[in-house]
Amino acid sequence: MYIKNVHLINFRNYDDMYLELSPNTNIFVGNNAQGKTNILESIYYSSIGKSHRTNKDKDLIKWDKNNTYLRTYVSRERLDKTIDINIFKNGKKAITVNKIKIKKISELMGNLNVVMFSPEDLRIIKDSPGNRRKFLDIELCKINNVYYHDLVQYNKILSERNTALKNWNNKINDIIDIYDEQLSKYGAFIIKERNKYLDKLNIIGKNIHKKITNDLEDINFRYLTNIKDFDNAEKELLMFFKKNRKKDFERNSTSIGPHRDDFEVSINNIDTRIFGSQGQQRTAVLTLKFASLEIIKNIIGEYPVLLLDDVLSELDSNRQKFVLNSIDKIQTIITCTGIEEIDKYLDKKQSQLYLVNNGKIKRV
């Protein structure tokens, strides 16, 4: 899988930009705030229907325009895909794949698979459980439409349950019984799929991490949930919802479920979030990202596109070398402010360089 070309109209700081990409390594060089990350953002949006930088689609539209247009042409082994997206300031958007209108975001996912690695991804390790849940949910939604459906349903019912808790009486108690049964069904599936994904990360990630650290470190991922028996997750969840209902009423929120879960990343049996050095935390994220690439490849038979947003300068020479030696079979799109540090690791025959300046791109 690789992107042949991208066409942007009124997207961020681009007026009308058409870009041909190499199926191998593409490097965009320029100072900060020139539009490098905007290119990656447009590709990411074409993959999952949302930005990695903002929750407001109108932020993607050039400030003096009423809409933006994105076209991404994707070469696939079986069938090429042309993804067209129109986003309007009034909040509406229209998406087609090979000229067929997309009604749900789940229909967009899987046409273009990408893995994004940016400096902000360090939050997956360092920050709150919400960042780790978001990582799992995004990766699972890319490869599992049922997961996407059940996650949407779970969050919808969870919101309704929380609203009901604020107005609790005997009649609403019966309604909450129904919510609890639905949440248990969808929540059990989410928990089991997350745990399975972490099992895959453990198998693949351990080998990757050992390569990066020259066998000096062992990494482990462990799902943190109240569920003890995954085979009976639905029954356990239902029991917890009923048991905690009074407490939930007092707090006006649901205190247990996959929306509260977390996962632990440990290196040599030490919690990386609390005790890991910044170098170890970066390496853990690197492992997560490259393991995600392999998981997608194992499921769909093709590598996704790898997006590296100004991260190579954050890595030491050994980690830079690992990254650039691992992408020979993967279309990779890199942004950076200079290539001096990584130039010695690049395969010049497989690399295409672009200069970015104030929304203008020049192929070198």
From Swiss-Prot:
Function, as annotated: The RecF protein is involved in DNA metabolism; it is required for DNA replication and normal SOS inducibility. RecF binds preferentially to single-stranded, linear DNA. It also seems to bind ATP.
Subcellular location, record wording: Cytoplasm
Query: Could you tell me which Gene3D superfamilies the record lists for this protein?
Result: P-loop containing nucleotide triphosphate hydrolases, RecF/RecN/SMC, N-terminal domain
PROSITE patterns from the UniProt entry: RECF_1 (PS00617), RECF_2 (PS00618)
Q: Where is the signal peptide?
A: none
Kindly state a single biological-process term from the GO annotations of this entry: double-strand break repair
Give the domain of life.
Bacteria
| Keyword rRNA-binding (UniProt) | no
Which is one Pfam family of this protein?
Answer: SMC_N
Q: Where does ATP bind?
A: G30, N31, N32, A33, Q34, G35, K36, T37
Q: Name one GO molecular function term.
A: ATP binding
- Per the similarity annotation, which family is this? Belongs to the RecF family.
An example Gene Ontology CC term for this record: cytoplasm
Write out the entry's keywords from A to Z: ATP-binding, Cytoplasm, DNA damage, DNA repair, DNA replication, DNA-binding, Nucleotide-binding, SOS response
Question: What does the organism's lineage look like at the top?
Answer: Bacteria, Bacillati, Bacillota, Clostridia, Eubacteriales
Protein name per the record: DNA replication and repair protein RecF
Source organism of this protein record: Clostridium botulinum (strain 657 / Type Ba4)
